[in-house]
Amino acid sequence: MSVNLWAPSASIATLKQRAVILRSIREFFYARNVMEVETPSLSGASVTDIHLVSFNTRFVGPGHASGLELYLQTSPEFAMKRLLAAGSGPIFQLCKAFRNEEAGSHHNPEFTMLEWYRPGFDEFALMAEIDELMQLILDVAPSERLTYQHAFEQVLGLDPLTASLEQLQQLACEQGFADIAKNETHRDTLLQLLFCMKVEPTIGQHKPCFVYHFPASQAALAQICDHDSRVAGRFELYYKNMELANGFNELTNATEQAKRFNDDNEYRKQNGLKQVPMDKHLIAALEHGLAPCAGVALGIDRLVMLATQKSNIKEVIAFDVTRA
């Protein structure tokens, strides 16, 4: 049977539902006096996260005859934090983000992200606000909350905060990942493998579930918790086999943030991965001063999938990567 590749991958009826959801999200924030902003999709720097790959290109123009390397952003986070440091107050953005990774039922290399930041909030206050939005858009019961440690122990019987590399390798072998475990010496890679493949499928099956207090080694751009230096003020939201959101009690210390970027790039160098330019504008903004705040990135396409009961991301976007 022939396929009309000129036609949208989503039905017009679904795209109309999507438009209503986007309008509802905007109204949610307008009612709370959260300002909508726009930031660049192209930047001279990008995320250093070792698990993310950015698209990059070269800009050839006045003053850049040999080409200026630019990256499509995996998230608007860095630029939005610069706005916060400049005194914007609470802000949100609906935008395209780009990740050079696989396409599948839950992934498209170009996708729509909702990101927002709340000065004066910690991760728990932000989780409560996200929960309100989930109830509005998905008409679901209030979310539940689990610590990363409890979720991991409940399914796999091992404390992820105290487990040694050898214990994680053994557990991964027992769970059917011997081909990876026998050569893996990075503790967090094993933690993420086990959590993704074995723990995540058990979370949020009946109602949305926040998993919080991720290991400090996976803090990314979150603060380390004052009460327990083994964990970070980071959380993720899961519902019906999908990771919907990733949020932080934001790191505001410029020195620590620069160290984390450098550590990522050192790991990249040692493991044959491309090093990524550190966002010096973000570091300068943190040096200027970023007030305590919490922020979150939420995948709009996956949210629409849940709201419209679709099983593939291409069913909720106008043109997936095969038709773009």
Curated annotation (Swiss-Prot):
ATP binds at residues 99-101, 108, 243-244, 299. Belongs to the class-II aminoacyl-tRNA synthetase family. EpmA subfamily. Signal peptide: none annotated. The lineage of its organism: Bacteria, Pseudomonadati, Pseudomonadota, Gammaproteobacteria, Alteromonadales. One of its GO terms (cellular component) is cytosol. This is Elongation factor P--(R)-beta-lysine ligase. GO terms for biological process: lysyl-tRNA aminoacylation. The gene is epmA. Coiled coil: none annotated. InterPro entries: Aa-tRNA-synt_II, aa-tRNA-synth_II, aa-tRNA-synth_II/BPL/LPL, EpmA, Lys-tRNA-synth_II_C.
